[in-house]
Regions:
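A transmembrane-helix-recognition feature enriched in membrane-embedded lipid enzymes
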Residues: 1-44, 351
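Glycine-rich phosphate-binding P-loop
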Residues: 48-65
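Short, flexible loop segments at boundaries between secondary-structure elements
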Residues: 230-232, 282-287, 325-353
Length: 353
């Protein structure tokens, strides 16, 4: 944990009970339609969210679930809040069924990534996700909505609530914000239909399995799945230069990331056998500048690195600054397994899609 965050949580601990109460009352009001109304769409809604602050692999999971839906002949649309994007409309169409319409600085890095990875799938953002989701149904004929980061967005009813936990952070310190990483008290997990532990690997498998048993003991009626990240390929800043995973691993790299859980990225590089000479971290959703890139190149050269390596999320924002020094991105896919695929198919079988 970063020192500043640790201090914030220590100071904020006294306010955690009050924040917990606010979130409990809010959920109660939505659940009973008192002052706060939860609206249902004419199509199914799958929410992919988390209980904790920070990264739990929601974007790879949205990508994975959406591809499963496409394979089943479903016409999904993705709805997101669009954090980090400058598009300020009530409804922002990041991608229609033909192409990506907004650049990453307008769309937000995660929605842009999803639009690029899932051609033909409408991706929309906006703060009022009920309005945005209705537009996706009416304008694009979507017959299912995938809501990114939707667990706390109770204004939109959902038919399947998937709650993700990172195998590297799990529940953090177990306290509710501002004294810890939890967005809500643990009792909020009663709303979920299933849990997914993401990023399981050899370094955390035993801890993840222990946490899975704890979840199963506390919520015996809710299935718990786990998924692992697998390297899918390498993006290279020079579009005319192909680079395989094997070639990238033979190079000396300087890594950097501006994501919620940068340790996860650096750990993945180490586990996959990349040779890393140094690293740099930026805040989540960081907007890179030419000065940032120049400083990164200088640090990489000073460390003896032959190239910079970063995440997909960061890479898409760096295109205006590509130069002669190579910048690579490690692309990651989430692998779930047949049990999860069957669970999703079974859950959808009751809907006319």
């Amino acid at each position: 944990m970063r020192p500043l965050l640790a201090v914030l949580f220590l100071v904020g601990r006294i306010f955690s009970p009050a924040y917990s109460l606010v979130m409990l009352v809010r959920a109660y009001l939505y659940r009973n339609d008192i002052f706060l109304k939860s609206q249902r769409l004419p199509v199914p809604v799958i929410s992919i969210g988390n209980l904790t602050l920070g990264g739990t692999g929601k974007t790879p999971m949205v990508r994975y679930v959406t591809r499963l839906l496409l394979d089943r002949g479903v016409r999904p649309a993705i709805v997101s809040r669009g954090y980090g994007g400058k598009a300020a409309g009530r409804i922002n169409i990041i991608a229609d069924r033909t192409k990506t319409l907004l650049p990453p600085e307008m769309a937000g890095d995660e929605p842009f990534m999803l639009a690029e990875a899932l051609p033909g799938v409408p991706v929309l953002t906006g703060s009022q996700r009920v309005r945005v989701a209705r537009h996706a149904v009416e304008a694009f004929g979507a017959n299912l909505i995938v809501m990114d980061d939707g667990f706390q967005h109770l204004a939109l009813r959902r038919d399947l609530d998937l709650v993700l936990f990172s195998a590297r952070t799990l529940l953090g310190n177990g306290r509710v914000f501002p004294g810890g990483e939890l967005r809500e008290p643990l009792s909020a997990l009663n709303r979920a239909h299933a849990f997914v532990i993401t990023g399981v690997d050899s370094s955390n498998r035993s801890v993840a399995e222990d946490f899975q048993r704890r979840l199963q003991g506390s919520f015996p009626a809710k299935p718990v799945f786990s998924g692992e990240y697998l390297p899918a390929g390498i993006w290279h800043s020079s579009q005319d230069k192909a680079c395989t995973l094997a070639e990238a691993k033979s190079m000396e790299m300087f890594s950097f990331a501006g994501i919620a859980n940068p340790d996860s990225f650096h750990q993945t590089l180490r586990l996959e056998g990349f040779s890393v000479t140094g690293s740099k971290e930026f805040r989540d959703h960081h907007d890179y500048t030419a000065q940032d890139v120049a400083a990164l190149v200088a640090a990489a050269r000073a460390s003896g690195a032959q190239a910079l390596i970063t995440t997909e999320k960061d890479f898409v924002k760096l295109r205006p600054f590509f130069g002669s020094f190579p910048i690579l991105a490690l692309t990651i896919e989430l692998r779930m397994g047949q049990k999860f695929d069957l669970f999703l198919a079974d859950h959808l079988s009751g809907h006319a899609l």
